[in-house]
């Protein structure tokens, strides 16, 4: 091959590379345009194909649609430790239309992201309920969690959203939503976000599982949990900042969810002192918002010693969840009646 033919070959490869690059960029731009217009999780960033709902899916992504739904004026935030609080029960007792935005397996970082999303779409909510459990006791300001969460979906940064749309799982949902939007019989995810995990636990025979029974009855160690001994609790700091930004009329209820007796530390132990310090830091955030109340469902009482009311040390049954919901509702009614 002579110099001339080599030059031609290089030119051909350069032309091919340019065509390939232009094609790839075109396909990428085309996909992103389609994904933005379809808005796979009904985030409201595009309303061209908005159905005001999503097809049945997990709460990590379904919360994008629920959290912006103007039908709701109150929300519950947390994880599975507050998931059993039924929004319809709260609504019936308070007159406030509630949505459940709790997401199992999440900690303060994810919950504060959802809190911010809800407030961007409901700048003056009538009420918010926040569950604070031991995940909030981390001393890491990054508020880490080992479970994946779509922070990009709730980010105010448009570029973060576009990067999130490039995920393969999201591309699958784009295709799925197109089929759902134009389907004759499309099932919708539950509008208020409530999911009854008691039914799931009972179907799995959790109450009869000896291994789980032993785990439930095993006392927690006396030593403080690693990374949760304080004295700094950055999640509480961020919560205080969020509460301070709420309108004065918004009623806030902070809940320490129930814990089975074996899951509570022995008084006077390092673990008890660390957990108390964490709860005190969380409770202190309520000073940043006057119309607020604290419900400590961890307080000593016979129900916390009843194994029939708990699936494990932190997941309780309706017999505890319903009275807790009523207690929350009563607190909201009192707060809303406060001048």
PLM feature spans:
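Membrane-embedded segments
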Residues: 71, 77-165
């Amino acid at each position: 091959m002579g110099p001339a033919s080599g030059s031609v070959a290089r030119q051909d490869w350069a032309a091919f590379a340019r065509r390939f690059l232009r094609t790839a960029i075109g396909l990428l731009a085309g996909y992103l345009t389609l994904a933005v217009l379809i808005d796979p999780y009904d985030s409201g960033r595009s309303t061209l194909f908005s159905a005001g709902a999503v097809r049945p899916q997990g709460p990590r992504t379904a919360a994008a649609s629920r959290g912006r739904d103007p039908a709701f004026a109150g929300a519950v935030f947390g994880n599975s430790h507050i998931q059993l609080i039924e929004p319809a029960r709260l609504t019936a007792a308070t007159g406030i239309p509630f949505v459940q935005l709790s997401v199992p397996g999440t900690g303060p970082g994810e919950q504060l992201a959802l809190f911010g999303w809800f407030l961007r779409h409901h700048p003056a909510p009538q009420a918010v309920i926040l569950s604070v459990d031991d995940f909030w006791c981390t001393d890491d300001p990054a508020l880490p969690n080992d479970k994946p969460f779509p922070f990009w979906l709730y980010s105010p940064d448009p570029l973060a959203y576009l990067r999130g749309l490039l995920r393969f799982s999201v591309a699958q949902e784009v295709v799925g939503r197109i089929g759902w939007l134009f389907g004759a019989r499309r099932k919708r995810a539950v509008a208020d976000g409530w999911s009854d995990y008691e039914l799931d636990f009972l179907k799995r025979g959790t109450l009869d599982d000896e291994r789980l029974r032993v785990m439930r009855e095993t006392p927690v160690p006396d030593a403080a949990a690693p990374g949760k001994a304080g004295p700094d609790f950055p999640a509480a700091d961020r919560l205080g900042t969020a509460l301070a930004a709420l309108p004065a009329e918004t009623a806030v209820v902070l809940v320490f969810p129930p814990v089975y007796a074996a899951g509570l530390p022995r008084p006077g132990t390092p673990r008890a002192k660390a957990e108390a310090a964490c709860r005190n830091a969380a409770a202190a955030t309520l000073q940043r918002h006057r119309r607020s109340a604290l419900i400590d469902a961890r307080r000593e009482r016979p129900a916390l010693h009843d194994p029939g009311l708990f699936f494990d040390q932190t997941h309780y049954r309706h017999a505890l969840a319903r009275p807790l919901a009523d207690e929350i509702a009563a607190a909201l009614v009192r707060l809303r009646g406060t001048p």
